[in-house]
Amino acid sequence: DLVYKELKYFKEIHKVEYNYFWADTFLAMNKKELDAFCEMYKEINLPFWMQTRPETVNDDNISKLSKVGLHRISFGVEHGNEEFRAKILDRRWKNKDIIERLKIPHKYGVAFSVNNITGFPTETKKLAFDTIELNRHIEADNANIYSFVPFHGTPLRKMCEELDLIKPETITKCLTNKPILN
């Protein structure tokens, strides 16, 4: 109800014409919640872009969302090496499953981009090229690559500090013009 009121307010008062739902957990909702969102969003009647992870996508949710305005998706793929992705990022999905899931949006006319990260602690050149290779098998409309940022409070930040790649007092930024890690 609050989400509906806020979306309606921005559409009517600020003349918003497009929404972007920036949350990796957007599709973590159950079927009942998804159906309620779709019913509510029908009234908002604006195109939208959402962020999610490949493992959350299925025909049912993309079909429903495309009917109420889903225009584009950003997928957090992050890394192309299965073992590295599982060990370092705790994401235990097979590349073949990612490739298959990312065929679904095209069935419903939904464009998508994939987001990748490079420069992780312990990542090698070969591992980085595994990400490129995975992306060659995904028919994304756009592929992005970002530099790893060791944010405070994350397990990877702790790992970077333990490996003496960054000092504990260093404040990191999302956008930078120089390397963050030693």
Predicted features, each with a name:
Residues 9, 31, 35-182:
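A structural motif corresponding to the C-terminal lobe/cap of the Radical SAM core domain
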